[in-house]
Amino acid sequence: AEASKDRIRVELLNYKRLLPGTKILCNIQAIHPLALVVSMCDQMLGHIPVTSVSEKLTERLQNALDQDDEDDEEEDEEDEDEEDGPPELPDIFSVGQWVRASVESVTSIGSKRQWGMGREGGEYERESQRVQLTMEPRIVNEGIRADDLSEGYLLSATVQSREDYGYSLDLGVSDDVHGFIPTKEILRVGAVLLVQV
C-alpha cells in the first residue's frame, strides 16, 4: 500500500492539459509564408506565426514594410542587397527541424473531427490553428538566470548580427548576457537557433 503512495502518475499530454506558458519541443512539419506548422508529442499540432519567431525578425519585417511604402514613392532607386531584406521562413527553417516553443494560446475545437479521415488539406491546417506557439527566446528561456548557464546547457537564441568571425546571439536571458557562435556558415539575422553552451 505504501509503494503505491510513492508512485507518480504521468498523464498524457492533450489539448485540454496544454496551458499557456508550457514549454515544449516541436518538430517542424510544414513551412508557410506566414507561419510554421509544428508537431508536438501525442500527435498534436500547433502553429507559430511569423511574428512569434523572434523580435529581431518581426523588427526586420516591419522595417521592410516601412521601406516598401517609401519605395513606392521613389521607384527609381536601385534594389537593396538581398541580405538587407527580411529572410523568409523557408530560408531560416527546414521541415524536420527541432525547435523549442512556448504555448501562447489554445482554442477549443470548433467542429467535431470525423473519425476515419486523415489530416488532409484544410483539416490539417485547422487542427494546427488550435495551438498558437511562440519561439521568441525571451519567452521560451523565461526563468533561466545567467547563473544557470553552464557548459552543456541547451537553450534558444536569436541571431542578432553578423560579426567578423561569426554571429552575435541574443539568448533572451537578460540584457547583459549575449552569446557568440563562431561559424563560416551563413545564418540569417532574426533566425532562432537551438544552441548549446
Predicted regions and their residues:
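Single-stranded RNA-binding regions, centering on S1/OB-family and related RNA-binding modules
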Residues: 1-197
